[in-house]
């Protein structure tokens, strides 16, 4: 019986490790064309908050390397956290020489303006792919006076320091978890939570990268399982202790890049 117990323990450990494994590395995508404008002021203070729910982009680690995406790219919020490489293209009058690249994270939504034509003011109208860059990032690729420039862009792996962060907000019967600092594909499409006394439960996306559960999780240590848009998953076991409090942030395992 002792031997059987040892075998079962080993098998359980192997299964747990296999569930937590992160196979492969996100490779990004091919080059496409779009246009870019800017917003938020010279210090990017006007970019704080936003439709992804990240709040203070400085304290969350995104800084000024951010952009608001048009409807065609935003994907109803599922693109939040995705990373892009951009270059100013085909406009020698306004593009900086050498076509330097910038790398940004999607943190906001650029709403359409149907009162303006899509080629004159309604830059974020569907089906146009468009980036409204934080002003400091726009100035890295083009002159301020340009206002709007054509760009080439592609999805790239997100390179982040540290682990995935889970910030738990809400109250006893409403848990709202903000997920930030995701490496690899960057944007997540599924989030699961497991308490000490529960099975795995799928959380529903509330808005941006805020995910909700109406289960009572207070008093239990919590594990989270993140699935990114490239279908890789990362499981962070028992990262929130049983005495966790609303408003706290916990760090889990990130994706390899």
UniProtKB/Swiss-Prot annotation:
Subcellular localization = Secreted, Cell wall; Membrane
State the family it belongs to: Belongs to the expansin family. Expansin A subfamily.
Which GO cellular component does the record give, naming just one?
extracellular region
Q: What does this protein do?
A: Causes loosening and extension of plant cell walls by disrupting non-covalent bonding between cellulose microfibrils and matrix glucans. No enzymatic activity has been found.
Recorded source organism is Arabidopsis thaliana (Mouse-ear cress)
Membrane topology summary: Peripheral membrane protein
Q: What is its main location?
A: secreted
Q: Which SMART domains match?
A: DPBB_1 (SM00837)
**Which pairs are disulfide-linked?**
52-80, 83-158, 88-95
Which GO biological-process labels does this protein carry?
plant-type cell wall loosening; syncytium formation
Q: Where is the Expansin-like CBD domain?
A: 173-252
* PANTHER family cross-referenced by the UniProt entry: EXPANSIN-A15
- In its UniProt entry, what is this protein called? Expansin-A6
Show where the Expansin-like EG45 domain sits.
Answer: 49-163
